Design a protein with these regions (language model features):
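Small beta-barrel nucleic-acid-binding modules, primarily SNase/OB-fold domains
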Residues: 1-166
Length: 166
């Protein structure tokens, strides 16, 4: 880990991890092989459709498409993750920077394969551009916005997985 600058919306006191992306678990979680070992990265400011976890936790529409879109952007590429904390699952919470300097997090939202993570009054939203990017994707009918009735992943986890109202 090396200290990272507070530029580009990344908080001061953050840290950078650099290495190849060796796994794309879903539309907002990847594994990066850093010099000290593999690190699970939870992409900040976004929440992608949930993959299924057996019969008790069915997946959301567009979960596979979201994972595939992210894989097309990052799989096998050496990237820098600008990180600022670890979450309750011991994942580094980061912005993934693509080789051209763009944010993979923003690219997921722009393409309509993730939501701006506005749950809990925006507690998880670090990038203030995300709601506007989501609005543009929705208005253009991109990705999951191509069909009506899209349910935010945080609502899906509660309603479907906890309350069994899928």
């Amino acid at each position: 880990q090396t200290p990272a600058a507070g530029a580009g919306g990344v908080p001061a006191g953050s840290y950078a991890l650099t290495g190849p992306i060796v796994n794309v678990a879903d539309g907002d979680t990847v594994t990066l092989r850093a010099p000290g070992g593999q690190r699970r990265i939870r992409m900040d400011s976004i929440d992608a459709p949930e993959e299924g976890h057996g019969n008790e936790q069915p997946g959301q529409p567009f979960a596979q498409a979201s994972r595939q879109h992210l894989a097309g952007l990052v799989a096998g590429k050496t990237l820098t993750a600008q990180c600022y904390e670890r979450d309750q699952f011991d994942r580094d919470v980061c912005a993934l920077i693509l080789p051209d300097g763009r944010s993979a997090n923003r690219a997921q939202v722009e393409a309509g394969y993730a939501w701006a993570y506005t749950a809990r009054r925006g507690d998880y939203l670090r990038d203030p551009a995300m709601p506007g990017l989501q609005r543009q994707a929705r208005e253009a009918g991109r990705g999951l916005w191509a069909q009506s009735g899209a349910i935010e992943p945080w609502k899906w986890r509660y309603d479907c997985w906890r309350q069994r109202r899928c």
